[in-house]
Structures are given as structure tokens and as C-alpha cells.
A protein has these predicted regions:
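Single conserved hydrophobic/aromatic residue that forms the stacking wall/gate
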Residues: 1-8, 12
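A short, structured loop/turn motif at beta-sheet edges
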Residues: 13-18, 77
């Protein structure tokens, strides 16, 4: 669980021809090696960017003594480039599994691009607050949601791919303050564009699930096979628009722009 300061150096950085791959220690001849979920944990990075939590800090579930959150939206936790995380999501408590890549309070000074999560038991990527941007990232056949945001996340995602298995959950699950004041600040305002969500035909889960106070800006989506493309409810005093210019919508976190 790296926790990086504003002077952080690279965390994991590789080239397209030789990506870093995290996966199970099982022998390659084991039948679970290729398709198993929950065979190990996952990658967790904690930073010092703002989060929507009383006191301004919190702990990732299952980790104590390593808080995340702070006051620096430009916090730099280094570089995550050409990284694959497969077969993770081991359970640390009943109904509590580890995400493939968790970015908790990570700031926009951090680089996350060309990363992939596959066959994770829980979510693919989850951002708890912070302002980190994602670019060229993919999630394949995870057991829960592909991209999950919470706790006042205000970053951006672009050129993202979701391929859902029959038992996968949502393409996106976007929250702001779980079990709390839906209008608390900072309010989640993910800005995602150029996203493809591919599902089996008549997949029972939403492609995008927006709830619990989130705002957001969502553009240029291709959605295939979901029963519901976008489901939006339980969002407090949210303002919904399609008329604001992009720069205006991104600068007003109380708006949902679709």
C-alpha cells in the first residue's frame, strides 16, 4: 500500500511491450490461474488530496494506521503506467473484498494511464475522493463494478473500456458521500468521456449508476447490452443539465451533465 508524498517518485512505470503484471502466485498449470478471481489482494495507493469525510481523512477498509486524504488537490503519488492487475480481490472480511486498483485521496499530480484490471472479485478501479485522472484504462470481467467513485472524487477519466461478464455488476457506480449528507463537500464530480461499456445481451445491471449525491459530466459513451444505460437517483439537491458548456459544467460540482 504505497502512501506517497508531494515529492513522490515513480511508483510503477513500464512500456507497452513489457507491462508490469500483478497476478496470482499459482502455478501456470493450475486450472484457476487464468480465470480465477480473488486469488490475491490488489493495488492500493493512498494520497493527500481532499475527500468528503469528517476530519478530512479516512482508512481504506481492511487497512488501519495508513490514512488517506488531505488538503492538496495537486498531490503527486507518482506514475502508474502500463500496469495490469489480474485475478485479485481476496476477501478480508465477509462481503469486503479488495479492489483491483484503489486510488484513495490521490491527487491530480499523479499519472494513471494504460492500466488494466481483469477478473477481480470486487471493483476494477475505485477512487475514494481525490482528483486523480485516468487515461487509457480498461476493466475486464470483474465481479463487481468496473469504475467506482466515492467520497468526493473530482477527477477525470478518458478513453476507458469496460467489458462485463454475465455476473459483473455495473459499468460505473458513482457516489459522493455514502450513508451521509448527500450535499456534503467536496461533492463527487467525475468527468468521464470517450467510454465504451460492453455487456452480454440484456445484462441486468446498469451501465452507469449515479447516486448518493454525485454530480458529474459524462460524454461520448458507447453502451451495449445493458438493460438501463443510465440510472440516476438519490442525489440530493442536484441540478441536471445538458445546456452548460463543458468548462462550466466541470467547474460546478452540484451539476450532473449527461
Amino acid at each position: 500500500t504505497p502512501r506517497s508524498s508531494s515529492a513522490a517518485s515513480d511508483v510503477y512505470k513500464r512500456q507497452a511491450e513489457a507491462p508490469i503484471t500483478f497476478r496470482s502466485e499459482l502455478d501456470a498449470t493450475d486450472p484457476n490461474y487464468g480465470n480465477g478471481r480473488g486469488l490475491w489482494g490488489g493495488l492500493i495507493i493512498n494520497g493527500y488530496a481532499p475527500i468528503a469525510n469528517d476530519g478530512g481523512t479516512a482508512n481504506v477498509e481492511g487497512l488501519t494506521g495508513v490514512p488517506y486524504g488531505g488538503t492538496d488537490p495537486d498531490d503527486n503519488s507518482g506514475v502508474l503506467r502500463y500496469v495490469r492487475v489480474w485475478n485479485g480481490g481476496s476477501s478480508i472480511a465477509p462481503d469486503n473484498e479488495i479492489n483491483g486498483i484503489t486510488l484513495a485521496g490521490v491527487g491530480r499530480g499523479t499519472t494513471v494511464e494504460y492500466c488494466e484490471v481483469g477478473l477481480n472479485l470486487d471493483d476494477g478501479f475505485e477512487m475514494f475522493g481525490g482528483t486523480v485522472d485516468l487515461k487509457y484504462c480498461s476493466v475486464i470481467a470483474v465481479g463487481d463494478d468496473a469504475f467506482d467513485t466515492d467520497a468526493g472524487y473530482q477527477g477525470r477519466g478518458q478513453f476507458l473500456l469496460v467489458v462485463r461478464a454475465d455476473d459483473s455488476d455495473k459499468g460505473h457506480e458513482m457516489d459522493s458521500k455514502t450513508n451521509g449528507d448527500l450535499d456534503s463537500q467536496p461533492r463527487s464530480h467525475p468527468h468521464f468521456a470517450n467510454v465504451t461499456v460492453i455487456s452480454s445481451v440484456a445484462h441486468g445491471e446498469d451501465a452507469l449508476r449515479l447516486r448518493e449525491g454525485t454530480g458529474g459530466d459524462f460524454r461520448n459513451y458507447i453502451i451495449h447490452g445493458a438493460n438501463d444505460g443510465v440510472r440516476n437517483d438519490d442525489n440530493g439537491s442536484e441540478l441536471v443539465t445538458q445546456d452548460l458548456a463543458a468548462a462550466q459544467a466541470h467547474g460546478q460540482p452540484n451539476y450532473l451533465y449527461i
